[in-house]
């Protein structure tokens, strides 16, 4: 990330990057190293909790919520931080030098990565299990987790994880550009609205909702089970996209945006966090870490890839760049995404029947 920042800094504010390929390579490399840490942190947390005799369903969510708190803090910071002519400031007013629009966001990401790197040395040790028998190459690479696909329940779980990963990628990739696109509206009230000029701050409501919903997971999992909890997530995605489709940044349309951000907490947590707990409970100790990696691969790997490609085709068909904003028939796009989430939810309800445990 610091490399991406340096390339942007060298090019100068508002200038085109001279070497786009190097920028993409550095960014992709950074993301490639980051993505496995999601599964790794889940596995580490579950291991430490169990080593200390704690309940993962009850005690993991309050820990996980701190990650969301950090997410919110950085969203607010990047939304408001400005670096202009060597002077740092914070503002809610529209400013082209805000970190959210410039290479400075990569600088923040790089510095935080170094801080987290150092923090990892303070974590409790998670000892590896030593096996008396010779470990195969498949086991060493963690590929033995793929045997979970032999079980119908886990195979369906991972398939639907990928489908929900597509939904997550849609909102990750297009929520911000969609809201910001209203700055190019012919309606002055919409173009100058607070929401259109502070998309990152507005969407942080999603993370606030996420933080609150994480704390509800223990109750819902124990009361209703994984199937109902995941169904709540799937239908929350329907509302997430649907509210975007009917809203706009000005009053009263912005209320729809706020509602979309609120239901995001259920859409994300009741699948991603609950799914991680479900995988930990269902898998044997020897493959728990690999299974978490497989879960992340299905959601943030396969699901995200197909989600990016499919959503890109849809958005490119209905929208186009005009005056620096991605404008067009966004309503149709969001309704298509909502329909997809609805089909996934109904299909999941019909085919996924997890075993009930006493």
What is each stretch, according to the model?
Residues 1-17, 235-250:
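C-terminal ends and interior cores of transmembrane alpha-helices
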Residues 8-11, 112-125, 332-358:
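Multi-pass alpha-helical transporter architecture, strongest
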Residues 35-53, 270-284:
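Intracellular juxtamembrane helix-capping segments at the cytosolic ends
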Residues 80-111, 313-341:
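A membrane-interface helix-boundary motif in multi-pass transporters
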Residues 82, 212-226, 315-316:
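Helix-to-loop junctions at the C-terminal end of transmembrane segments
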Residues 123-157, 184-186, 191:
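Juxtamembrane intracellular "pre-TM" segments in multi-pass secondary transporters
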Residues 173-197:
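Short amphipathic helix-loop junctions that connect adjacent transmembrane helices
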Residues 227-275:
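C-terminal transmembrane helical hairpin of 12-TM major facilitator-type secondary transporters
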């Amino acid at each position: 990330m610091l490399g991406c920042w340096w390339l942007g800094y060298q090019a100068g504010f508002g200038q085109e990057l001279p070497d786009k390929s190097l920028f993409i390579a550095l960014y992709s490399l950074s993301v490639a190293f980051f993505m496995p840490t999601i599964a790794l942190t889940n596995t580490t947390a579950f291991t430490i909790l169990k080593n200390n005799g704690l309940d993962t369903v009850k005690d993991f969510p309050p820990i996980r919520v701190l990650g969301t708190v950090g997410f919110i803090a950085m969203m607010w910071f990047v939304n408001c931080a400005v670096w202009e002519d060597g002077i740092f400031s914070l503002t809610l007013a529209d400013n082209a030098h805000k970190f959210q629009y410039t290479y400075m966001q990569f600088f923040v990401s790089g510095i935080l990565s170094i801080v987290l790197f150092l923090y990892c040395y303070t974590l409790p040790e998670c000892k590896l299990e030593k096996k008396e028998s010779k470990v195969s190459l498949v086991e060493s690479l963690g590929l033995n987790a793929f045997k979970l696909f032999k079980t119908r329940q886990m195979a369906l779980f991972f398939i639907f994880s990928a489908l929900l990963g597509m939904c997550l990628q849609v909102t990750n990739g297009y929520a911000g550009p969609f809201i910001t696109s209203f700055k190019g509206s012919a309606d002055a009230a919409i173009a100058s609205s607070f929401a259109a000029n502070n998309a990152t701050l507005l969407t942080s409501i999603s993370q606030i909702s996420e933080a609150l919903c994480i704390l509800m997971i223990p109750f819902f999992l124990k009361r209703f089970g994984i199937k109902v909890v995941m169904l709540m997530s799937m239908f929350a995605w329907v509302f997430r996209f649907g509210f975007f489709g009917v809203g706009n940044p000005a009053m009263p349309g912005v209320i729809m945006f706020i509602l979309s951000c609120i239901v995001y907490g259920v859409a994300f947590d009741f699948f991603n966090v609950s799914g991680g707990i479900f995988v930990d409970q269902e898998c044997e100790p020897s493959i728990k870490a690999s299974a978490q990696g497989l879960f992340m691969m299905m959601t943030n790997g396969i699901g995200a890839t197909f989600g990016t490609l499919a959503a890109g085709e849809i958005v490119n068909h209905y929208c186009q760049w005009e005056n620096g904003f991605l404008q067009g028939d966004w309503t149709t796009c969001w309704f298509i995404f909502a329909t997809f989430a609805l089909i996934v939810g109904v299909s999941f309800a019909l085919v996924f029947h997890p075993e009930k445990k006493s």
